[in-house]
């Protein structure tokens, strides 16, 4: 699971009503999840929360089981736009339910930036040498590709770059390395970097914004003028699960409006079930863009299946290894 998706604030009720224990193993990237599923430990997991860049591959690879949607009646309440996407639909079968979605925003320390930076290019400013953090994930590759203009005219091109384009992305990221204090792998790691004043800029998640504000840290979050990538997390049942009936009941519980609101309270992410909005204040709806969701969609380039994922990872690993 991604961090925040098995918080006791909302899993405890399911545990009590179903006389079970929800035990989470958190992941730091989509590739980490795929490695766990393929590495012989798939039977350790009943439910997974893959993002939209690997959900299709997991479905096609037989790592998830087709869902019986009659056992998940709340599925029909989920956003029609999200349900219409082909990400988890293979051969007429549905392998996952949309759960949460959101952006990969630019996070900044407001004591260093009274006004929100308006471009991802700020990460490369020599003024912030050693004060930047980026995610150990292909999202960093996508972000550099955006700055190089590879999202125009088709943002989907970010997920199918040519060898030449990937080499240019690599050069761009190598230019960033002097500014990078640390490449973060978990949400808690980035939260600590900000709280310890080790960094003032980072690509992050709304979860970190939520956590830092709860801790009293003055963090800002923005989507720069280049826009940003975004993700749709799905809940799936692993093919190796020995508790498929219980897992189906868990999926049903997790997409119900009240649970979705509780997950949003923990993570700051946008719920896949619009009915969760009835439990929110006007400010909460505004902060999640639920009143202008169609416009918000246009600012996010949702992750897609990456046909040449191994090549992307090779480029990213070369960037990380460079001195």
Name each model feature, range by range:
Residues 167, 172-176, 213-239:
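Periplasmic-binding protein-like
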Residues 1-57, 191:
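Early extracytoplasmic/lumenal segment of secretory-pathway proteins
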Residues 45-49, 183, 200-205, 220-221:
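Paired acidic/hydrophobic, glycine-rich loop segments that form the ligand-binding mouth/hinge
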Residues 55-57, 201-218:
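A ligand-binding cleft/hinge motif common to bilobed small-molecule-binding domains
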Residues 229, 238-297:
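Mature extracytoplasmic/periplasmic domains
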Residues 105-112, 147-148, 232-243, 262:
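A bilobed periplasmic-binding-protein/Venus flytrap-type ligand-binding module shared by bacterial periplasmic
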Residues 293-323:
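Conserved C-terminal helix/tail region of periplasmic/extracytoplasmic solute-binding proteins
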Residues 3-7, 44, 49-55, 59-195:
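Extracytoplasmic ligand-binding site segments that recognize negatively charged/polar headgroups
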């Amino acid at each position: 699971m991604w961090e925040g998706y098995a918080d006791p604030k909302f899993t405890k009720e399911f545990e009590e009503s179903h006389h079970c224990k929800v035990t989470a193993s958190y992941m730091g990237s989509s590739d980490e999840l795929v490695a766990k599923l393929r590495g012989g430990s798939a039977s350790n997991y009943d439910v997974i929360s893959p993002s939209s860049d690997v959900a299709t591959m997991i479905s096609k690879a037989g790592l998830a089981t087709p869902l019986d949607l009659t056992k998940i009646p709340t599925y029909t309440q989920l956003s029609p736009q999200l349900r219409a996407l082909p990400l988890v639909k293979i051969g007429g079968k549905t392998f996952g339910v949309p759960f949460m979605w959101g952006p990969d925003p630019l996070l900044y320390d407001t004591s260093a930036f009274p006004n929100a930076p308006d471009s991802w290019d700020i990460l490369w400013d020599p003024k912030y040498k050693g004060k930047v953090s980026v995610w150990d994930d292909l999202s960093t590759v996508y972000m550099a590709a955006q700055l190089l203009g590879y999202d125009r005219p088709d943002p989907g091109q970010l997920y199918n770059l040519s060898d030449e384009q990937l080499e240019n992305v690599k050069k761009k990221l190598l230019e960033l390395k002097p500014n990078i204090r640390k490449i973060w792998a978990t949400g808690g790691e980035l939260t600590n970097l900000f709280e310890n004043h080790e960094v003032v800029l980072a690509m992050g998640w709304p979860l970190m914004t939520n956590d830092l504000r709860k801790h009293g840290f003055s963090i800002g979050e923005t989507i720069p003028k280049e826009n940003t990538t975004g993700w749709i997390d799905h809940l799936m049942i692993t093919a190796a699960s020995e508790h498929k009936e219980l897992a189906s009941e868990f999926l049903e519980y997790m997409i119900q409006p009240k649970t979705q609101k509780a997950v949003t309270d923990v993570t700051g992410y946008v719920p896949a079930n619009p009915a969760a909005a009835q439990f929110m204040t006007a400010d909460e709806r505004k902060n999640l863009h639920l009143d202008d969701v169609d416009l918000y969609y246009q600012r996010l380039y949702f992750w897609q299946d990456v046909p040449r994922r191994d090549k992307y990872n090779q480029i990213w690993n070369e960037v990380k290894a460079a001195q």
